[in-house]
């Protein structure tokens, strides 16, 4: 009797990746989203490309550098040397969400650029997190004693954002904003929206971005694939 090896489907693979929150592989899971569009993509090759970038970055950081020095090295490497940037001219291109393409073209949207930036930051031992800010995904570095507080960065541009700039970005998303009512942003309100996003939340936002793009394009085949992933990722929703 002949036995044929049954290879797991891309959805089976995705299901395995997102089973547990205890050890959720953000980068690998984000890369795997591209399998719907690029079924022959070699995920390990993409992960290896990121590892090479991490190794190159580490060689640029001096021993005993503090967190802010590491952050400067990271941003210089990512935005200036590697020239990762936001895809301003084609923001709604779904390929901006596929990390194999983002790595190749050095262009993406805030959340896809953030996933790569976070991986590089973590390779330096930095306490970096994604921030699911309304309307625009951000990243932040948590500082520890003696450098307390955090630095919030727009991964689309590489800019560090002040409290006032963050408040200005938040105001349009608050109740009453469309009525033109003046808004005052409390520290507690801002802190709430600057909470660290869990990996599962980041992947969900990436999928919802794709869902919205394909919905507008009335691409039912791709919509179905995105919905299947969301159902696996968020079974209780």
Segments and roles (model prediction):
Residues 1-237:
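A structural boundary/capping signal
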């Amino acid at each position: 009797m002949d036995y044929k090896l049954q290879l797991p489907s891309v959805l089976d693979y995705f299901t395995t990746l997102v089973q547990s929150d205890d050890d959720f592989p953000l980068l690998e899971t984000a890369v795997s989203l591209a399998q719907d569009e690029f079924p022959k993509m070699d995920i390990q090759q993409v992960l290896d490309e990121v590892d090479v970038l991490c190794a190159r970055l580490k060689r640029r950081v001096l021993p005993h550098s503090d967190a802010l020095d590491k952050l400067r090295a990271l941003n210089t490497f990512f935005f200036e040397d590697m020239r990762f940037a936001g895809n301003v001219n084609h923001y709604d291109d779904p390929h901006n969400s596929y990390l194999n393409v983002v790595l190749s073209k050095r262009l993406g949207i805030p959340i896809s650029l953030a996933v790569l930036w976070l991986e590089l930051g973590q390779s330096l031992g930095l306490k970096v997190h994604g921030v699911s800010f309304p309307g625009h995904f951000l990243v932040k570095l948590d500082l520890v004693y003696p450098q307390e507080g955090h630095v919030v960065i727009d991964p689309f541009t590489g800019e560090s954002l002040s409290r006032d700039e963050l408040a200005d970005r938040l105001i349009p998303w608050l109740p009453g904003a469309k009525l033109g009512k003046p808004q005052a942003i409390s520290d507690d309100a801002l802190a709430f929206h600057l909470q660290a996003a869990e990996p599962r939340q980041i992947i969900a936002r990436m999928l919802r971005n794709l869902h919205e793009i394909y919905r507008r394009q009335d691409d039912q085949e791709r919509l179905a694939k995105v919905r299947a992933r969301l159902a696996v990722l968020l079974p209780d929703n």
